[in-house]
């Protein structure tokens, strides 16, 4: 099938219909949800750290604790605003630190725990008990535990959230088919952190975040806004830099772009990952105009603002919308796609066109209807030879 035959089903009609709605939907987050403030951020970071130092840790609650940590960085007021703006009716539980007494092998011990409705004091106590066992083992092996190996090192919470940044890009698939890719990527980018923490098990932590995002969809909205806020904040630790790279690679540099779901103005529907290729697409000129209408998040924002990160995919696949450009590996042209494309016509046409480009060695930029500035950016970045490019 020719690429010219691949069309998006009545995109603009959908947009018009949704834009004229006079009503909004209110959702409930449940009876009570925990919304911690800045003052308990250090304690939540330590909880993440306890899980990270625990050898063979049980990560059942790691996703939840990671999200609580993210909210503590945003602060209670901003988290509430995010949820309310997303249409959620919120009954928020304040979170404080209290002393909890718990029996451990017949002996009463005291633990500092948080007043959470989502995580009992006993569970928090058990996390600390298990972490102490691993810490004692570390003391025997090392003699002295360096700060970056401890459970209270400042980047523990962000290490956990790096895994969440990888998971969030795969949610639109509707299942956990992206888990293997998440694990592979985490093993690569967090390899130094995995040397520090034996409890950093990407598969288990990723599954925990999948569970949280599936069970509590309001956390998706919170995490996306947290990711934007975190990535836009200057400075920070090395792990904060890793997080920003992971999140913005998904959100702002190509993979998380245009899909019909973006019309619903839903943050969840913007998070695409491999599912982007399964969505219905228009051809690039129409998509480009539509993306301009919707604003930077929807389309070719990254061409104008981050050409270095995106022009390679633009070079390889110029006749597709930005979401396909940014997710070329998922499309299968690079031989990475292992799923069944829902839009087989698009997949076949894209593959055929890419193979044609490869055989001819000529890239036709004219189909993109690019501005002079964009063409100049491409030339400056790629330094193409005149006989390699049709302008």
Swiss-Prot record:
Isomerase is among the record's keywords: no
Compartments where found: Virion; Host cytoplasm
GO cellular component: helical viral capsid; host cell cytoplasm; ribonucleoprotein complex; viral nucleocapsid
Modification Phosphotyrosine, positions: 38
GO molecular function terms noted in the UniProt entry: protein serine/threonine kinase inhibitor activity; RNA binding
GO BP: any one term: symbiont-mediated suppression of host cytoplasmic pattern recognition receptor signaling pathway via inhibition of MAVS activity
Alphabetized Pfam families for the sequence: Pneumo_ncap
Signal peptide per UniProt: none
PTM comment, free text: Tyrosine phosphorylation modulates viral transcription and replication.
Taxonomic superkingdom: Viruses
Subunit (UniProt): Homomultimerizes to form the nucleocapsid. Binds to viral genomic RNA. Interacts with the phosphoprotein P. When in a monomeric RNA-free form, interacts with the phosphoprotein (via N-terminus). Interacts with protein M2-1; this interaction allows the association of nucleocapsid with the matrix protein. Interacts with host EIF2AK2/PKR; this interaction inhibits EIF2AK2 phosphorylation of EIF2S1 and blocks EIF2AK2-mediated translation shutoff.
Function: Encapsidates the viral RNA genome by forming a left-handed helical nucleocapsid that protects the RNA from nucleases. RNA replication depends on the availability of soluble nucleoprotein. The encapsidated genomic RNA is termed the NC and serves as template for transcription and replication. Together with the phosphoprotein, sequesters host NF-kappa-B in inclusion bodies (IBs) thereby inhibiting this host defense pathway. May also act as a modulator of the innate immune response by sequestration of host IFIH1/MDA5 and MAVS into IBs.
Region of interest: Involved in RNA synthesis and encapsidation: 1-364
Protein name: Nucleoprotein
Keywords: Capsid protein, Helical capsid protein, Host cytoplasm, Host-virus interaction, Inhibition of host innate immune response by virus, Inhibition of host interferon signaling pathway by virus, Inhibition of host MAVS by virus, Inhibition of host MDA5 by virus, Inhibition of host NF-kappa-B by virus, Inhibition of host PKR by virus, Inhibition of host RLR pathway by virus, Interferon antiviral system evasion, Phosphoprotein, Ribonucleoprotein, RNA-binding, Viral immunoevasion, Viral nucleoprotein, Virion
Spans annotated as Interaction with the phosphoprotein: 244-290, 338-364
The keyword RNA-binding appears for this protein: yes
Species for this entry: Bovine respiratory syncytial virus (strain 391-2) (BRS)
Family under the similarity heading: Belongs to the paramyxoviruses nucleocapsid family.
